[in-house]
């Protein structure tokens, strides 16, 4: 069927009957809409047996089909089975299957980017009930779209954090008053699991991540003997592995991202002595990542991403009351409203896959807004008098808004993540001052959105001051 130069448009005519014996037939086609140029096979008589079909895409960018691209026309009894060697063929954001037509076209075979309700086979084994084109069905998107979306979302959020994520309870550094400025080093580990959907619910993605961040204060000082300032540096390593499964095609896609960050942070506390009043925290990071997207029996795609993320956070701590416990604990209850704005400017490099698909991700420049309240109990037991030991369990609730949707354009067709524009979050954890030098903190939290979006994570941090 292949002509010199590989241009589609050849027609193979069989004047009699055709019997397939698991042979292979290759067609060239420019995959797009119904009227796309393609090689064709025209059987005047009957068909029977099984035939493997390979379709080479010649410059097609993918598009929605209605009836499909006619590949095989049958004039007589259409009892033969034709199946793609790979189960599907892809162009742009779309997945094409080989299916029989409907109505007056029920004898013919078409390449369709519409879902027919039948998952295509990964191998061209004989099929008793071949798929049928459904002109009213939804278009089918490639699972790779979910991997690109997961990677760009991770690149912008892996190192995003809050004041107490980074430093636990900064006011546990009490040696400032008695010994001058205190230096400190801190480290935190984060593990998380995210579930999301894309492409009108077709693509289901699960992702597991790990984050390591560490840093230290360069300076601490007070401007009026009551407030306190922190200035420090930080760096980190993170990775994430995602898996996207389509509920309409028979193959899946894997996304991987790993990279580093480095930057600065600065924090101001209004009233260090009473641990109340306002605070303002800010940080900025430069981030760089290596990314890959791979799928079953298809070429892997490697690319990089770079960019800056930055945040400003503020809050106000109220002392809500004090009380003594039955076992000799002195408890002080605090309430702390918080607000945070994070700018996420990490961008993937626009590029073209080996299969000719142009990849452009969206969502960089997202502004994430968080509004919430944290309430915690500072507890000190009598037996810890003189030991500088304190424990601070807490719970917080947040509303999170993202100004942009993370998405990917594949040859100009946009597929976006769903359900993550507005999120509700609950966290609970504990911050502990073990002694005058060592502090520990940890928490677990869950975020819930629309359309099945969820994110669960746990964190453990440690800080040593001297």
UniProtKB/Swiss-Prot annotation:
Looking at the record, the residues that make up the Autotransporter domain are 178-466
An example GO CC term for this entry is:
outer membrane
Disulfide-bonded cysteine pairs: these are: none
Which Gene3D superfamilies does the record cross-reference, listed alphabetically? 2.160.20.20, Autotransporter beta-domain (2.40.128.130)
Pfam name, any one: AC_1
Identify the SUPFAM superfamilies for this entry: Autotransporter, Pectin lyase-like
Q: Which domain of life is it from?
A: Bacteria
SMART domains xref list: Autotransporter
What is the name listed in the Swiss-Prot or TrEMBL entry for this protein? Uncharacterized protein YdeU
Q: Which organism is it from?
A: Escherichia coli (strain K12)
